[in-house]
A protein has these predicted regions:
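Active-site nucleotide/adenylate-binding loops and adjacent lid/helix of ATP-dependent enzymes
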Residues: 97, 105-183, 190-195, 221
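ATP-binding N-terminal substructure of ATP-dependent carboxylate-amine bond-forming enzymes
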Residues: 1-101
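Short, solvent-exposed amphipathic alpha-helical segments in soluble enzyme
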Residues: 19-22, 190-193, 204
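Catalytic core of tubulin tyrosine ligase-like
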Residues: 195-202, 208
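Short, charged, surface-exposed secondary-structure boundary motifs
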Residues: 41-42, 60-64, 109-115, 209-211
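A long amphipathic alpha-helix within ATP-dependent nucleotide-binding catalytic cores
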Residues: 208-226
Length: 226
């Protein structure tokens, strides 16, 4: 089985590569790519085959690159490993010859924008922290960048203790109350009809480069039922 993973300098891609290397049941060939030359990023030395890719911002060139690699390597599955790639693949789903699994473009693009995603969740009566229109009577808040990955663009400030506030008052950011407590990430595996088949809550133990690096699987019926 030939599996392609792009943007392999990232933590997400490296984690996927390491997970695939542990699978003994199947003969898996990992094909990796990134904008760097081979040897300039660690991931390029961890895959079976490596290709230097054009920047994902060059959409037409990137799609042609994916199709060229698919033709040369007969790729069975492409695993998107970044938000930007997920948006691009869903946008050009009919032009990419390699098989991959993603939601439709409207859904992927919606959740790329954290403010729009939060507003949509509210419309569907899903409980999320409210959006602060002003900071009067607020205590501790979090400024969130609308389009960002990992924990980039996060600014947390205790208004009762801070002597000054960084200027994040512009349309690229929005503000919510800061919620104290543990962070639980929930992995959901669904079938083609969107019916959940496997739900795994994970309590974050360690964060690396803005993402959950170590987690503890927890059985919480309340979270699973949501």
């Amino acid at each position: 089985m030939n599996i392609q993973i792009n943007n392999i300098h990232s933590t997400n891609s490296l984690s996927i590569i390491k997970a695939l290397s542990r699978i003994e049941k199947y003969d898996i060939i990992v094909i990796g790519s990134d904008i760097y030359k081979k040897g300039e990023c660690a991931g390029s030395l961890l895959v079976d085959k490596y290709y230097q890719a054009p920047p994902i911002t060059q959409e037409a060139e990137y799609i042609n690159f994916l199709n060229d690699v698919n033709e040369k390597e007969n790729v069975d599955l492409l695993i998107p490993a970044s938000d930007a790639e997920a948006v691009l693949l869903s946008k050009y789903i009919n032009q990419v010859k390699t098989k991959f699994f993603l939601a439709d473009y409207e859904t992927v693009a919606l959740f790329k924008d954290k403010l729009k995603a939060t507003q949509e969740l509210m419309k569907n009566n899903i409980k999320v922290p409210r959006i602060c229109d002003n900071l009067f009577n607020e205590k501790k808040v979090i400024f969130r960048k609308r389009n960002s990955v990992n924990s980039l663009g996060i600014y947390i400030v205790d208004l009762e203790k801070a002597e000054y506030i960084e200027n994040h008052f512009h349309p690229d950011y929005f503000v919510q109350p800061y919620i104290e407590g543990d962070t639980v990430i929930v992995d959901v595996f669904s079938d083609k009809e969107g019916v959940p088949k496997l739900i795994i809550p994970r309590k974050t133990i360690e964060i690396k480069d803005g993402t959950a690096f170590r987690s503890q699987i927890v059985y919480d019926e309340t979270i699973i039922a949501i």
